[in-house]
Swiss-Prot record:
Residue ranges of coiled coil: none
Keyword set includes Hydrolase: yes
Source species of the chain: Yersinia pseudotuberculosis serotype O:3 (strain YPIII)
InterPro entries hit by this protein: CdiA_EC869-like, CdiA_helical, Hemagglutinin_rpt, VENN_dom
Hydrolase keyword on record: yes
Record CDD domains: CDI_toxin_EC869_like
MF-aspect GO terms: deoxyribonuclease I activity; toxin activity
Pfam families for this protein: CDI_toxin_EC869_like, CdiA_helical, Fil_haemagg_2, PT-VENN
Function, as annotated: Toxic component of a toxin-immunity protein module, which functions as a cellular contact-dependent growth inhibition (CDI) system. CDI modules allow bacteria to communicate with and inhibit the growth of closely related neighboring bacteria in a contact-dependent fashion. The C-terminal 123 residues (954-1077) has DNase activity in the presence of Zn(2+), converting supercoiled DNA into open-circular form. Toxic activity is neutralized by coexpression of the cognate immunity protein CdiI-YPIII, but not by non-cognate immunity proteins from other toxin-immunity modules.
EC number in record: 3.1.-.-
Protein name: Deoxyribonuclease CdiA
Span list, region Disordered: 531-555
Subunit structure: Interacts with cognate immunity protein CdiI-YPIII, which blocks its toxic DNase activity.
Length: 1077
């Protein structure tokens, strides 16, 4: 570091790398050849290795034991390269940097209290690139001997235990609920399997057997992530800023100004003067993900039970990969308080850059190009799985084969301009002269000045728009098939493949970033070579950037695929239950028939047998078997439970319909919005079978009634009981509950079981949002500023006016007056009774905004909705102002006053020296206080607010890791937590919250809601596993959320942050806040 009152250094070459040159007054650095102010590089690398080997006796996860060896190995390698910039700065004086040849400023800052001037033959100002790479691998292998239960009941019990364990380990509410339903239905299957064996005359030995198998299973996964993030240079002048590229007497090969991914700011004027070219460019932040996984295994063994001895073999294989890459731009910005002037001897290019000044003047010798840049984010993942097994009887029983295959794919593409390239002038206007051609590609020349102050004089003018697009697709294809004798270790339905044939989901959004020039004079001198009609150029610069945000949520779509798979498996279980019930009914019927065989039955059976076996004579045993089989088949078909029967087809249709809704708010969707879709799927699935169609609608009717009834499921299996569903199904089928036949009772039981499973698994994670049938939305608060009634009336009047083509300003003024009058009353309430404003008016105002956010499809349920987007915007603006007023003026002290008025809390208040003082002022001060533990610079963290996870979230996560023990980093995309210290049991979740969005500034309550959501997820964490790493609640001793917020977070927002901190304490979660400036 070089520090002095003033500094004047002259040399042939000057280099400042990762250092500081600071003076109170003037600084002048003069190099006869090259002057470089750049960064010092730092590199870090680390490797974490976890390896575990086990041998001997272990659990299988179900009811069984495993004898063999197990091995797990994970490696995590990281490498980080970062750059520490230099600083050249004068507190109160001028800064001049001069070079005879090249002047380079790289990832560094130059600050002048007064004027700042850079001069060189060529001047380059660029951004440093910080990079981080991580390679994570996980391997597991297991081989040995497995002893487990087999037989119809034994296999069912084993499946139920395994599935229940999976439900306990699942963190996502709805997935846990579906797993719980699977476990419960496995119990039903176990009971049924025993009933069927008993009906067939068997005992305990036929129900349960033992299987012994020798096998192996191994899996591996790899993931590599690479990130580069730029850290731009910054030039700041208290007065004027100038950059000049002289060309050094060789203008043919030099004389360029290049500024990339950097920020220039001057309180006065800014001037760029280049003998040749001026380039203002964006700098790219990049991320890349590559991953793959594979698994395979198999086993061979024998199963012994009352039904005989069987030899079986199983095999499975799976593989997948993912690819992701993204580019996100850091724009060059020039911000001048006075005039911005530019001269280039040849070309001037702005690509990913914004120039802002009160007045803009530019003289371009040849071509002027302005071009916006699109952020890009692409992702593609594929996964395939296949498994199969065969069981061959050695003695007794029957052969069986099962096959299962599935394939998933996720694909997403995102391309959109975020920050539009442009020249933005204030009241001084723009004056641009271009020697030859001006090209605007999705860029603007904008001015707030009167049209007579804006001129563009060019040889020719070209312009084009940029199309922004976001699209994603999610596909699932799969099925399973099992045939043959008794139920084996796989209890999925024989028709599972027909249940889960496939699913598709997707999304699409688009926008247009237009080229535009503000109103003013455009002169095209070379009309002969002008290609486009200038009249086609947009003059609306304020609405030119039709940017769109990302619409693909990878985790949500992956969970959607899991839900579809689980719904299909639940449906398969329900179909198996129905089929087994049909077998039980048929077996009882056949047994009864054998007790009362008539002579004509014997004659008919003999003819049937001999027709099926030409040339052979039937024995008495053959005839008896034929009588039994005929009675069995007739009863099974009449029961409706067989393949193609109305019960089976109705259940299949209901399952297919509900699968199509997977992933969203199932409770809300089922209660009416998707009724046409559901009806269409049912009709397609059941065809012309009215009984099947009616049964499918009965199942969905029961699920819908359950969802709309707001029953609190909370993910618990079995809460949605078949008894609860049965009355609705009986009613839908048009049957009398007092006169049901045995067959009808069995049908109701099977349909109720399916309805309970679907409702229980699907609504458990979202019952708080479920709509109560046709009355949905009618219970909203009816008193809002504008209250809901006023908002709806305003909406109708404005919509009718617009349709008539009249002048609608009078309508808007009328309702604004109503809003203003009610806002005046709010001011009085805030002054005289602020607590009332907090507990009543605030809820009322929020209700007004809530009605603007109701989706249009709710109108089909009888709910009132607003249709005019214009009216919605006005209500949101007016009510948002009142909400902001309430949050700023009342929430802090009112909440604290309520707290302090409790005698049990007054000791704490007195310890703060507040008792006996003005409680209102003290509370306001206390609740609105800044409770951050530290303040750090954004450049040291490497983050930028409001620019997405890549530029905001990930840098903060990396920064937090620098303060934690080496080796505590969890794998990328680990659930809930980012760091876990195995030595102490401490877990940390790193979060960043941009409080400066319009939504959070106008409604500070959103700050509390966002933090509370993170606290709840942290507090309720039970277990997560990824890439061979497992963390469960028993391993955790302390939980912490490390939160980053902008340094200019408002006092009202700090009130909400402090509320969240107190809430976290009650939940056992520590919230630590750091300000980032």
């Amino acid at each position: 570091m070089l520090s002095a009152g003033s500094i004047d250094v002259s040399s042939q070459n000057i280099a400042v790398a990762g250092s500081s040159v600071v003076a109170d007054k003037d600084i002048r650095l003069r190099a006869q050849e090259n002057l470089t102010v750049s960064t010092a590089q730092q590199s870090e690398s680390g490797t974490q290795l976890f390896e575990q080997k086990k041998s001997g006796l272990m659990s299988t996860g179900g009811i069984g034991v495993f004898i063999g060896t197990s091995r797990q190995k994970t490696t995590d390698q990281t490498q980080t390269v970062s750059h520490i910039g230099s600083t050249v700065g004068s507190l109160t004086g001028n800064v001049r940097l001069e070079a005879g040849n090249q002047l380079t400023l790289h990832g560094s800052d130059v600050v002048a209290g007064k004027d700042l001037a850079l001069t060189g033959a060529d001047v380059a100002i660029s951004a440093a690139e910080n990079s981080r790479s991580q390679q994570y691998t996980a391997e597991s292998k297991q081989s040995g001997l497995t002893v487990a239960l087999s037989g119809p009941v034994g296999s069912a019990v084993n499946t139920a235990v395994t599935t229940a364990k999976a439900a306990r380990e699942e963190n996502t509410g709805r997935l846990a609920g579906l797993q719980g339903v699977k476990a419960a239905l496995s119990g039903v299957q176990a009971v049924q399997a025993g009933q069927l064996v008993q009906a067939q005359g068997g005992g305990i030995t036929e129900m349960v057997g033992v299987s012994v198998s020798l096998g192996s299973q191994k899996s591996s996964s790899q993931q590599q992530q690479e990130q580069t993030q730029v850290s731009g240079s910054a030039l700041t002048a208290g007065n004027n800023l100038s950059i000049k590229a002289t060309g050094g007497g060789n203008a043919a090969n030099s004389g360029d100004i290049l500024i990339a991914g950097s920020q220039l700011k001057a309180g006065g004027d800014t001037r760029l003067d280049a003998a040749r070219d001026v380039q203002l460019l964006g700098a790219a932040n990049r991320q890349k993900t590559d991953g793959s996984n594979s698994s395979r295994g198999g086993s061979i063994g024998v199963s012994v039970g009352g039904s005989g001895l069987s030899v079986f073999a199983n095999a499975n294989k799976g593989q997948g990969n993912e690819r992701g890459d993204g580019t996100f731009w850091t724009e060059t910005t020039v911000d001048s308080g006075g005039m911005f002037s530019l001269r280039s001897g040849r070309d001037t290019t702005l690509t990913g850059a914004q120039v802002s000044a009160e007045t803009v003047k530019a003289d371009v010798g040849r071509n002027l190009t302005l071009q916006s840049q699109q952020d890009r984010d692409n992702y593609d993942a594929k996964q395939s799985r296949a498994s199969g097994g065969i069981s061959v009887p050695v003695a007794g029983g029957g052969a069986a084969v099962n096959l299962s295959m599935s394939r998933d794919r996720l694909s997403s593409q995102y391309d959109s301009v975020q920050a539009q390239t442009g020249i933005f002038a204030g009241s001084g206007g723009v004056d641009i002269r271009v020697g030859e051609h001006t090209q605007l590609d999705g860029a603007v020349i904008a001015s707030t000045a009167a049209a007579d102050k804006n001129t563009l004089d060019t040889g020719t003018l070209g312009f084009s728009d940029i199309k922004n697009k976001a699209v994603f697709t999610v596909e699932h294809q799969g099925g399973s098939l099992s045939t043959g004798g008794p139920v084996g270790s796989d209890l999925l339905s024989n028709l599972g493949g027909m249940v889960l044939a496939g699913l598709g989901n997707g999304g699409y959004a688009e926008g247009t970033t237009q080229a535009a020039v503000s109103e003013g004079t455009i002169t095209v001198r070379d009309t002969e070579n002008q290609q486009q009609n200038v009249d086609d150029l947009s003059r609306d610069t304020g609405n030119a950037n039709g940017s769109i945000g990302p619409i693909f949520d990878k985790e949500k779509e992956q969970n959607r695929l899991k839900e579809v798979q689980l719904i299909g498996e639940i449906g398969g279980q329900a179909l198996d239950i129905a089929s087994t019930q049909g077998k039980i009914i048929a077996t009882h019927a056949a047994n009864d028939k054998m007790k009362a065989v008539k002579p004509e039955d014997i004659v008919a059976a003999e003819k049937q047998w001999e027709k099926a076996h030409p040339g052979k004579a039937a024995t008495a045993e053959d005839i008896n078997q034929q009588i039994y089989q005929t009675a069995y088949n007739q009863a099974f078909n009449e029961s409706g439970f067989g393949t193609g029967g109305p019960v089976q087809r109705g259940m299949q249709a209901a399952i297919a319909a509900v699968q199509g809704l997977a992933g969203g708010n199932m409770g809300a969707a089922l209660t009416g919005a998707s009724a046409p879709y559901l009806a269409g799927v049912i009709k397609q699935s059941t065809g012309d079978n009215p009984a099947a169609n009616t049964m499918a609608h009965a199942v969905l009717g029961a699920v819908t009634a359950y969802a709309s009834g707001n029953h609190a499921l909370a993910g618990a299996a079995g809460a949605a009981t078949a008894e609860l569903m049965a009355p609705t199904i009986i009613s839908a089928l048009g049957w009398d509950k007092n006169t049901l036949t045995e067959g009808q009772k069995q049908a109701v039981s099977a349909l109720s079981t399916l309805a309970a499973g679907l409702a229980g698994g699907l609504t458990g994670d979202s019952t708080a949002d479920a709509l109560a049938g046709g009355q949905a939305g009618k219970n909203a608060v009816e008193n809002n500023y504008l209250n809901s009634t006023q908002a709806l009336t305003f909406d109708k009047e404005l919509s009718d006016c617009r349709k008539s083509g009249g002048n609608c300003q009078a309508v808007i003024d009328k309702w604004k007056k109503v809003s203003d009058e009610q806002s005046v009353k709010l001011d009085e309430t805030l002054k005289n009774n602020p607590l009332e404003a907090q507990v009543w008016d605030k809820e009322v105002a929020q209700g007004g905004i809530a009605i603007t956010e109701r989706p249009g499809w709710l109108s089909s349920l009888g709910a009132d909705v607003m249709s005019s987007e214009e009216a919605k915007a006005y209500v949101q603006q007016w009510n948002g102002q009142d909400l902001s007023k309430i949050d700023v003026n009342s929430p802090g002290w009112t909440k604290f006053a309520a707290f302090a008025s409790d005698p049990e809390n007054q000791v704490a208040v007195a310890s703060l020296g507040m008792l006996g003082k003005d409680l209102t002022k003290a509370a306001l001060s206390y609740m609105g206080r800044n409770t951050s533990t530290a303040t750090v610079s954004a450049s040291s963290v490497g983050m930028k607010w409001g620019q997405g996870n890549m530029k905001q979230g990930m840098p903060w996560e990396d920064y937090v890791g620098k303060t934690l023990p080496v080796g505590s980093r969890l794998p990328p995309n680990f659930k809930t937590y980012d760091y876990f210290d195995r030595a102490t049991g401490a877990v940390v979740s790193a979060k960043s919250l941009d409080t400066q969005t319009m939504a959070k500034l106008s409604n500070p309550n959103q700050v509390y809601s966002s933090i509370k959501k993170n606290i709840d997820v942290t507090a309720k964490f039970e277990k997560a596993s990824l890439s061979g790493v497992t963390v469960n609640s028993s391993m955790i001793t302390s939980k912490e959320v490390r939160l980053a917020v902008p340094v200019n977070t408002t006092k009202a927002q700090w009130t909400e942050i402090n509320r969240a901190i107190e809430y976290g304490k009650n939940q056992g979660v520590k919230v630590t806040v750091t300000q980032v400036k």
